[in-house]
């Protein structure tokens, strides 16, 4: 499983890429691999105010449907409609296929997430 350096990871297998006071959120390689071929993605509304732990969206595969949770508080600034049009993008490039761009409300929440090294150890225990 690919784990990229420089991202933050949640125990629910979401990744967060921080750029200033904004963050891109998506699902990890482990998550997409576990789901199998992704056939449908539901994203949040632009402008939605989300709290950490809220459902960010839904990813459906031929095997299962899975909620995706936001690991941080934030306002949805943008969604990636390309993955709605072609959900297989997430299978092919999970770290390039973000789901939502949010305005971070509290950067200290990032301290609750895992680094790449911590996430690799977490995956070894899964």
From Swiss-Prot:
Keywords: Lipoyl. Binds 1 lipoyl cofactor covalently. Its cofactor is (R)-lipoate. It holds the Pfam family GCV_H. It comes from the Bacteria. One of its GO terms (biological process) is glycine decarboxylation via glycine cleavage system. CDD domains: GCS_H. Residues 22-103 form the Lipoyl-binding domain. InterPro entries: 2-oxoA_DH_lipoyl-BS, Biotin_lipoyl, GCV_H, GCV_H/Fam206, GCV_H_sub, Single_hybrid_motif. Transmembrane segments: none annotated. PROSITE patterns: BIOTINYL_LIPOYL, LIPOYL. One of its GO terms (cellular component) is glycine cleavage complex. The modification N6-lipoyllysine is found at residue 63. The glycine cleavage system catalyzes the degradation of glycine. The H protein shuttles the methylamine group of glycine from the P protein to the T protein. The glycine cleavage system is composed of four proteins: P, T, L and H. NCBIfam families: gcvH, PRK01202.1. Belongs to the GcvH family. This is Glycine cleavage system H protein. The lineage of its organism: Bacteria, Bacillati, Bacillota, Clostridia, Thermoanaerobacterales. The gene is gcvH.
